[in-house]
């Protein structure tokens, strides 16, 4: 159970010492980290955010390779963090174990599902932490808690030893308060030990996406554009694109997910092609979640909290219809975005539609925010491209952020880029 003196971040406090045997100083020596309760640690039951899951599963017989690699690199783990049940929320509220307290905005949600991991970093309880990001579970809490969050290219970091949510989207991500630590951790997890700064060929600002966001456009975009100019001397091409229009024209399989609601919803709250992209992503997530956990749910009949329960019921009812179309959307989107970005282009989008919502917010208002959030989160989610959420301080006393997205496999480039820009943002 979470305790009061740690912002409610931890489900269990336990020190796991480094295992490095190298004669030279390991790369993460002296750093501490926290582990989301989705990763196996030998000898303990992985809780997956739900007491019934904890009760009906056995202790892990081995530790997830991603955790082992961090320990081998010299880092010390200080505990296991709270997460949203079954990783099925981006809100950060857990009806069973309590909601980790957002250190930057006490009356706002911390974001999920990697809520405790983000809070532990933001509250300076650890130097970095690991989480997972399926539909936004690293990017969202990073934004809400005012820290850096990195979602790698899908498959770039091993997912062995973590409880799956939806394998087509599951990634291992990490949080840090500064880009130097973010990069150091990335070098270990990505097994890339020499990441030199590379100038981006173009900075592509998805102008229409910023209309989904309540934070003023210039407040998010100008610091980034200015930092690129200062870092690289103004050689990077900066251009704007209507991303929704581009995706709509170049991902034809999205037609299977377009609805009349997408077209008639007010423009400031909806980009039809991105709504369709979000629908495709969430359908395939539900399908894979059902395959992974449907039998356990039917057998155990676990108790789920509000919001989670309804989402899981919907997943259990999901049919196989349109699943092939989901996979076509993914393939077409990868091609379309690869063409748009070129070799070293970077896409600029809001991480989320605005500052973190209030705790126990109105359900209808929260659903509108969630819908716009998934329009943004599905871009990297479906394509499998890497994305970093960059904190930009406070707006009206609440944390705000912007994101950079780079093509599949460009993780090292993106980590080095954000590290180069940090001094000027």
From Swiss-Prot:
Catalytic activity line of the entry: a monocarboxylic acid amide + H2O = a monocarboxylate + NH4(+); indole-3-acetamide + H2O = (indol-3-yl)acetate + NH4(+); 2-phenylacetamide + H2O = 2-phenylacetate + NH4(+); L-asparagine + H2O = L-aspartate + NH4(+)
Modulation of this protein's activity: Inhibited by phenylmethylsulfonyl fluoride (PMSF).
Database matches in Pfam families: Amidase
Entry's Gene Ontology cellular component terms: cytoplasm; cytosol; extracellular region; nucleoplasm
Tissue-wise expression: Expressed in cotyledons, leaves and flower buds. Lower levels in roots, stems and siliques.
Protein localization: Cytoplasm; Nucleus, Nucleoplasm
Temperature and thermostability: Optimum temperature is 35-37 degrees Celsius. Optimum temperature is 37 degrees Celsius.
Enzyme Commission code(s) on record: 3.5.1.4
Modified residues (N-acetylalanine): 2
Effect of residue 133 to A: Loss of catalytic activity
UniProt-annotated catalytic positions: 36, 113, 137
pH dependence, record text: Optimum pH is 7.0. Optimum pH is 7.5.
Effect after changing residue 214 to T: Slightly reduces catalytic activity
Gene3D superfamilies: Amidase signature (AS) domain (3.90.1300.10)
Keyword presence, 4Fe-4S: no
An example Gene Ontology biological process: indoleacetic acid biosynthetic process
Molecular-function GO term, any one: indoleacetamide hydrolase activity
Disruption outcome: No visible phenotype under normal growth conditioins.
Similarity annotation: Belongs to the amidase family.
Function comment: Amidase involved in auxin biosynthesis. Converts indole-3-acetamide to indole-3-acetate. Converts phenyl-2-acetamide (PAM) to phenyl-2-acetate. Substrate preference is PAM > IAM. Can also use L-asparagine and 1-naphtalene-acetamide as substrates, but not indole-3-acetonitrile or indole-3-acetyl-L-aspartic acid.
Name the record gives this protein: Amidase 1
Lineage start: Eukaryota, Viridiplantae, Streptophyta, Embryophyta, Tracheophyta
